[in-house]
Amino acid sequence: MGNTATQISGYEKSIFEAHASNGHLITHDIYRRGSGAPVVLLQELPGIGQETLSLADELVNAGFEVVMPHLFGPLGKTSIGGNLVRVMCLRKEFRLMTSDRSSPIADWVRLLCREIRDQRGVKGVGVIGMCLTGNFAIQLIGDDSVLAAVASQPAMPFFKQGELHMSSDDIEQSRNALDVKGPMRVLRFENDPMCTQEKSKCVHRAFNDDGNIRVQEITLPGRGHSVLTLDFVDQSGHPTREALDNVIQYFSSHLSPPI
């Protein structure tokens, strides 16, 4: 990644609103940049900081259009503590501690993916979810509008690492979709305290229990957390660099640009 990321002022801004399954109308700003096959980049808890903007640059430079919803927090900098408070206040959108069902915001992202697919005239989009949005990527791969998904350090539900932030119906739908679309990617550090080995085992039990690899996990050495952003090291041969290269190759093989 370059030393200076393209700032948010270099993005095209729009607004997307849609009703979640609970009936709540959700509205957020959307930032777009680049051309090519669309990839929806979902922010992690620290926010859309410089590291996330650098990740977006990597995707744009690889030939993708980045579509980045602004879900919470300041733009251009990280705010872990402040954003945690903000998300806790967005109870109609996020359910941080809930297992066996997802957050309403995941419904909104699904509708966003469908709109992007239809607007761009493509077969489907890619999705990257990170940290508290990581589980959303696992759920969204079950939708026809999503052809490829990456869950980086999926941490929700917090304090329940042996459970998933999605319903049994969601799991079944994603399993069936992955049988057709091929394995998605999950990224995590081996000793991540927020996305633990217990979480890894939970994902494998849910998706790879019958010997069919629906979720391909890329495990990196160390105790980091944010594989593609805060803990990313842009050096040839570094595990995080190799993980990002794998993600780009995965998207390139599964997504097609607009005609």
What are these regions (language model features)?
Residues M1-I259:
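N-terminal cap/leader regions of alpha/beta-hydrolase-fold enzymes
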